[in-house]
Design a protein with these regions (language model features):
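Internal, conserved structured core segments that host functional sites
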Residues: 81, 89-140, 162
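Conserved active-site and cofactor/substrate-binding residues in soluble primary-metabolism enzymes
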Residues: 10-17, 93, 97, 157, ...
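Hydrophobic/aromatic beta-strand patches that form the interior of the parallel beta-sheet core
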Residues: 38, 84-86, 115, 172-177
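Predominant activation on well-ordered alpha-helical scaffold segments within soluble catalytic domains
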Residues: 16-23, 103, 160-163, 167, ...
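Flexible, glycine/proline-enriched loop segments at strand-loop-helix junctions
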Residues: 5-9, 85-95, 145-153, 183-187
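Catalytic cores of processing enzymes, dominated by hydrolases/peptidases
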Residues: 123-203, 207
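N-terminal short beta-loop-beta anion/metal-coordinating cradle
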Residues: 2-88
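A conserved C-terminal secondary-structure "cap"
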Residues: 184-294
Length: 294
């Protein structure tokens, strides 16, 4: 079963885009979307005041309420192999109850492996390979090495707790977190979605048609390249990020510490100011720069 929850650990909408791609390509029903085999009671988990669902106001009345849905769908990969997809908004509350409900699904459908997808914003350039953090509740499941050394204290998530609880209950679970350039974290970044699904293929032995995601990723990269070619100041910041990334990579290969490096690296504040303009240029017309890529 593949898990992708919206709301957290979804920089660049990587997990949400990946889930939508799976629904679109793995549906076995004529009307698309696959068969919903389990539905969670969202009222038990959702904080409507924190994440208000959109509604439509048509002149003098309300209509078109987009109710949040947290469901499990039966899908099929490119070779016809069946698998489940749990997707929807991350529960705001009652995480333990959510984990127990997922356990019921796992046992009811004899799920042998749960694979989660996520993404985090990182100070990395889009011109370098997307790094993936591998994690699992059973070390035998790991399909790659972790880029981290030692321990980190990080904010928890429902997906992370689910992996922990499933391990305690004797069920296998693993996941992948893509590192998305932080200046692209608010945009759809299909390149990260494709990287996540490539890892899902390896872990789950599914065959997923990634052609459409590849096309979308190439189009996004072309948009970014056009924007940077017309905005030298932002290009300079990306170049600084590349230098920072390569400095860390060299130090990692040589086993050196960066604490002794004399090379000045751009600060988060410096990058943030530049990337506010970057995001504005990609999302809409930039009056001060003569337009943005389409």
């Amino acid at each position: 079963m593949v898990v992708a929850l919206d709301g957290f650990l979804d920089a660049g909408n990587a997990g949400a885009l990946a889930a939508r791609h799976l629904v679109r390509t793995g549906a076995s029903t004529p009307d698309g979307g696959g068969v919903v085999v389990a539905t969670f009671d969202v009222d038990e988990f959702h904080d409507y005041r924190a994440r208000r669902p959109p509604m439509t106001f048509a002149r003098d009345h309300y209509e078109g309420y987009d109710a949040p849905r947290l469901v499990v769908r039966l899908l099929h990969d490119a070779c016809g192999a069946p698998y489940l997809l749990l997707h929807g908004p991350e529960p705001d509350i009652r995480w333990e109850a959510f984990c127990r409900a997922v356990l019921e699904v796992v046992d009811r459908f004899s799920v042998s492996l749960v694979v989660s997808m996520g993404s985090v914003p990182m100070a990395v350039p889009h011109t370098r390979p997307i790094a993936i953090t591998h994690h699992a509740n059973n070390p035998d499941l790991l399909t790659g090495t972790s880029p981290w050394r030692g321990e980190l204290r990080v904010p928890s998530s429902a997906q992370a707790l689910l992996e922990v609880r499933l391990g305690e209950w004797g069920r296998d679970a693993q996941g992948f977190v893509a590192h998305v350039p932080h200046y692209l974290a608010q945009l759809d970044y299909p390149r990260a979605s494709k990287a996540l699904l490539e890892q899902v293929e390896i872990a789950s032995r599914l065959t997923i048609d990634l052609d459409d995601l590849g096309v979308a990723a190439d189009e996004r990269e072309e948009e970014i390249a056009r924007y940077l070619s017309a905005n030298a100041e932002v290009q300079d910041v990306v170049t600084a990020l590349e230098q920072q990334y390569d400095t860390f990579a060299r130090a990692e290969e040589e086993g050196r510490s960066l604490l002794a490096e004399d090379e000045p690296l751009p600060t988060g504040e410096d990058l943030g100011r530049q990337f506010e303009q970057f995001l504005a240029g990609l999302e809409g017309p930039d009056e001060g720069q003569g337009g943005s890529p389409r």
